[in-house]
Amino acid sequence: MSFSHFDTRRFREHGFTLIELMVTVTVAGVLLAVGIPAFSKLIANNRIATQTNEFVGALNLARSEAVRRSQGVSIRSTNGSVDFASGWKIFNDPGLTGAAPAASDVLRESSGLAGKTTLKSVSRSGSSPSFTYTVSTGTSIVFNSLGGNNAGTQAFFRVCDSGDTSIKGRILQVSTVGKVSLDSATATCP
């Protein structure tokens, strides 16, 4: 009987050694410990961006409806405060008052923003590049039949994550002609 032709491949062990497995688990743990906080911040930043875009869409809808209908259209916080995070209503406002609408005048209503996002009407003071933004008394913005901001002044909104002040907020600016843009300044969130 000759063992030279004996196939030893059948008897080899397959798999990982305990040391290889421990090294792999350790490396994976380190990567997760570093990656998860950064990923959480990325998710929060994306949530702020998405919800900012949602409100920009609402402002643009109100402006375009004012032009299309040739009459005033307003957007007002649902609860009548400076806090738009709980929701807003877009409604016909031929008197250009921004006052709470009748149910029949409402064109669109939002249930608000999800999560810990805040959206407040703010006023700007100071000079560039060190503007400061403080909560204002504005509960609505009125677009006239030409699509302009009926107040004749700029309006500002601050979008923030109330759960994490390290996340940079965003400032929305509505110009006197009604154009909505993202202000280059980042909001300092309280």
Label every PLM stretch briefly:
Residues 19-38:
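Alpha-helical hydrophobic helix detector
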Residues 1-10, 34-47, 53-60, 64, ...:
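N-terminal helix-rich module
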